Amino acid sequence: MSISRREFLKANAAVAAATAVGATLPVKIVEAAEQKDNIKWDKAPCRFCGVGCSVLVGTDNGKVVATKGDPESPVNKGLNCIKGYFLSKIMYGKDRLTTPLLRMKDGQYDKEGEFTPISWDSAFDIMADKWKDTLKTKGPTAVGMFGSGQWTVWEGYAASKLHKAGFLTNNIDPNARHCMASAVGGFMRTFGIDEPMGCYDDLEAADQFVLWGANMAEMHPILWARLSDRRLSSPTSRVHVLSTYENRSFDLADNAMVFRPQSDLVILNYVANYIIQNDAVNKDFVNKHTKFALGTTDIGYGLRPDHPLEKKAKNPGNGKSKPISFDEYAKFVSSYTLEYAAEMSGVEPEKLELMAKAYADPNVKMMSLWTMGINQHTRGVWANNMLYNIHLLTGKIATPGNSPFSLTGQPSACGTAREVGTFAHRLPADMVVANPKHREITEKLWQVPAGTIPPKPGFHAVLQSRMLKDGKLNCYWTMCTNNMQAGPNINDEMYPGFRNPENFIVVSDPYPTVTAMAADLILPTAMWVEKEGAYGNAERRTHMWHQQVKAPEGAKSDLWQLMEFSKRFKVSEVWPAELIAKQPELADKTLFDVLYANGVVDKFPSSECKGQYNDEADAFGFYVQKGLFEEYAQFGRGHAHDLADFDTYHETRGLRWPVVDGKETLRRFSKGDPYVKGDKEFDFYGKPDGKAVIFALPFEPAAEEPNEEYDIWLSTGRVLEHWHTGSMTARVPELYRAYPDAQIFMHPEDAKARGLKRGDEVIVASPRGEVKTRVETKGRNKPPRGVAFMPFFDARQLVNKLILDATDPLSKETDFKKCPVKVMKA
């Protein structure tokens, strides 16, 4: 392979730009330097964020030795961010777990005992005993699982089947509850169907971009590289950035806005009002394709019912609405004037107006992008609805460059948590357990008796913690997530439930995380390309990979664990007699037989596996992944969630659903979408009348605000070098050295007022706990006076101890962005 001087110079220029977002060299340059014939390369989606980059995985002598950006990927086009570059090292931490560990004392299980190695059979024996006893004495609502947006598609599907059709409980919820539940709520309320209508191609087609509380430069760096390329190559392109503190995304901002926490609701309504007042409503679009509704207000904060804020709320948890007219909506938002928005938000009026004008201009294609700043919000569903309001009022939606785009945090929060339906209230393809017709469809496809799936939603993530603490949830299995570090209000609501002597806690993880160390039984887990998998990214792209190396001896995939565990239960041991009477032939079968060896999941022979390895197929005697996928895909085909056949995904870099007649769909709800029929330009077919809903929703304050004692807002989040709790990235030496310790970022004047300076050790405290850290007054994050920021990747500084477990009452998603604290010298 040769490179010309011109190509070399061009590549260097590209690298200079890419370095700003932690991107790596284009693959062509990398290959020129490497050329190691003994390395075998295969594709896989990246293990980290929801962008869904494709990487080439290099294996040699049974180990992953290198990764690089995939030049054939339409997502990342050969680029990697810094985390993707070091993917090859995430599986080889020195403390990788390889044997089950049970708390024992004097040779027996003991809640206060020391972790002791045991066999897999022994681990499943004690698990089965605990589950059977709990199911018998307390019933299905006393067992549950906390899963992950990092599960593969079939892991999430197998887990959902095991609980909803096996253990007869809806007590399964993913960690996506903490990050994407408000996005789901926004989609379902406005459009009646989940996930973005646009795609990443809109980054190259949009004229202007608005980032609503999204630090894309660090959290979605490859998409930021594409956005940056558009901004720098188009003279008329502009970038507006809103956040509660300055971050690296502000480096590219033409219009930088730092707003007071919670006031984004005011700004959103101001923009809608501006559009109406300046006669910029796309009347033809609005009349044909939208309707208006007034949302219920004063809905509380998702706290325990006896909390004063819940007692005070008039309509706690009420998501109902009533129809209104356009004129009534216009009157509702008319009080959200420029002056009011500027006063409430602290943003300069001219900056707010500049952004509003861009939305209102019919000749400017607009792309809105948001993630945790909007979703992790006590009114996150409302904020999502209000963002869609702006795009619907102007008709700037579902066409190239006009895109309200909800970004995703995890690699399969879309593909697994949302599409598969691993939430406590959901079923596959946007169906819900509360709907009798949806339960009937699911039960028929799963070949289980009518009435198997409970109609009542199970415990959501925050409620699971409360129920564990209260002794109402007693057998609990956590997989592929580290909630004891990532979840809210750890001291008061989470840790007590794990250590409640009534409860038996199981954690499946490759490493001894904070969550694992609080458990009773730890199960060692296979990672990433140590198993065959599929993820679904933020643009509806489903992408598969083959197993490329063996897991360390003793570590088993989540899928194997779920299916093998199901063999320990006979139907007669877990189902009531009246349910068995409907299909008595199932009585002596195991849950494995009923759920996974049902003639559909097990119909594909192991010989169809095309990867070098497939440990699950070897263990169970059939192509497990293909069988689970093809059964699951039946839910969406013909129902606007169409997936291609299994084998096609292994031959591509992913396809965006709906996939009909072998063709993916770039944009939904507009011409080109196979579900938009005839000569229609738009059809919001998730709603029975084909019309999207524009909601009238007000500003409501945060659950807590700073006071005399706790006088500064704290926001938590991520950094470029680490992902979530650092359970993988902190074990990569290069990433750990790049960012070893969390700090609290403060305004220099706030630090000075407290007698602090950069580098000082401090105590950060809220009414719920305290952490010790160091002050940072410079660097990448620059909060305004009265605001501080602290990342949550550092297991030695559990900052989420400080966070109140207040949630959006509609989505049940926690607000991690607004916590009053005090900062004191240590």
UniProtKB/Swiss-Prot annotation:
Binds 1 [4Fe-4S] cluster. Residues 1-32 form the signal peptide. Its EC number is 1.9.6.1. GO terms for cellular component: membrane; nitrate reductase complex; periplasmic space. Substrate binds at residue 792. [4Fe-4S] cluster binds at residues 46, 49, 53, 81. It comes from the Bacteria. It is an enzyme of class 1 (oxidoreductase). Residues 39-95 form the 4Fe-4S Mo/W bis-MGD-type domain. Its cofactor is [4Fe-4S] cluster; Mo-bis(molybdopterin guanine dinucleotide). Keywords: 4Fe-4S, Electron transport, Iron, Iron-sulfur, Metal-binding, Molybdenum, Nitrate assimilation, Oxidoreductase, Periplasm, Signal, Transport. It is found in: Periplasm. GO terms for molecular function: 4 iron, 4 sulfur cluster binding; electron transfer activity; iron ion binding; molybdenum ion binding; molybdopterin cofactor binding; nitrate reductase (cytochrome) activity. Pfam families: Molybdop_Fe4S4, Molybdopterin, Molydop_binding, TAT_signal. GO terms for biological process: cellular respiration; Mo-molybdopterin cofactor biosynthetic process; nitrate assimilation. Predicted to be exported by the Tat system. The position of the signal peptide cleavage has not been experimentally proven. InterPro entries: Asp_de-COase-like_dom_sf, CT_Nitrate-R-NapA-like, MoPterin_dinucl-bd_dom, Mopterin_OxRdtase, Mopterin_OxRdtase_4Fe-4S_dom, MopterinOxRdtase_cofactor_BS, Periplasm_NO3_reductase_lsu, Prok_molybdopt-oxidoreductase. It catalyses: 2 Fe(II)-[cytochrome] + nitrate + 2 H(+) = 2 Fe(III)-[cytochrome] + nitrite + H2O. Mo-bis(molybdopterin guanine dinucleotide) binds at residues 83, 150, 175, 179, 212-219, 262-264, 372, 376, 482, 508-509, 531, 558, 716-725, 800, 817. Belongs to the prokaryotic molybdopterin-containing oxidoreductase family. NasA/NapA/NarB subfamily. Catalytic subunit of the periplasmic nitrate reductase complex NapAB. Receives electrons from NapB and catalyzes the reduction of nitrate to nitrite. Component of the periplasmic nitrate reductase NapAB complex composed of NapA and NapB. This is Periplasmic nitrate reductase. It comes from Shewanella halifaxensis (strain HAW-EB4). The lineage of its organism: Bacteria, Pseudomonadati, Pseudomonadota, Gammaproteobacteria, Alteromonadales.
